[in-house]
Amino acid sequence: MAEQNADPEHHSSDSAHPNRQAGSIKPTHMEIIKTAIDGPVIIEPRIFRDDRGYFFESFSEREFREKVADVHFVQDNESRSCYGVIRGLHFQKPPFAQAKLVRVIKGSVLDVAVDIRRGSPTFGRYVAVELTGDNHRQFFIPRGFAHGFSVLSDEVVFQYKCDSFYAPQSEGAIAWDDPDLGIDWRIPADRAILSEKDRRHQMLEDIESPFEL
């Protein structure tokens, strides 16, 4: 991740500096790392450290829209989980489909995005990223992907933004242990903790994906 020793207050957004015209300077606060699948990207913040601790911008809508996607997030969610928990693989069907921006505040997870866009050359493939409270990475998952994560640490605090409100009538999911996906969740099978609902999801080949590229 990008780091720099500096005074945090001197590196916040332009609006914090009254002698600057808004928009006259566009500092870079995030590095975008592409993944093997078109769409999902990893975001690394620019971190400023000194004797007091650290500072970074965890989100800038302007920079996100310029560098990642023209997305407007409307809802923030937070969950706490213990080691071995696996949540997923979830999505919302159109017209309530969701893009997500996820991060870990404490602990570590393996975060997974599965391409379920019919007609995509990477349909059925996935990207897995380790997110931790120390690496401060964020993972952007566009619409058309199923999302899930496994908890690798004793405890995790997980946050994510959504660009569409939760709509239970539009819930969709695929099985976390679908053999065609072959996801290594890095959790022994006898230690995996799932909700009863997540244990009953269908395999990808058995559903008609509502997404098309």
Residue ranges and their predicted role:
Residues 17-23:
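Short Gly/Ser/Thr- and charged-rich N-terminal loops/segments
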Residues 131-140, 145-150:
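Beta-rich strand-turn-strand
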Residues 2-11:
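Extreme N-terminal basic, low-complexity initiation segments
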Residues 9-10, 16, 28:
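Intrinsically disordered, low-complexity cationic segments
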Residues 144-162:
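Ligand-binding loop in jelly-roll beta-barrel domains
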Residues 26-137, 155, 162-213:
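Non-catalytic, conserved peripheral segments adjacent to functional cores
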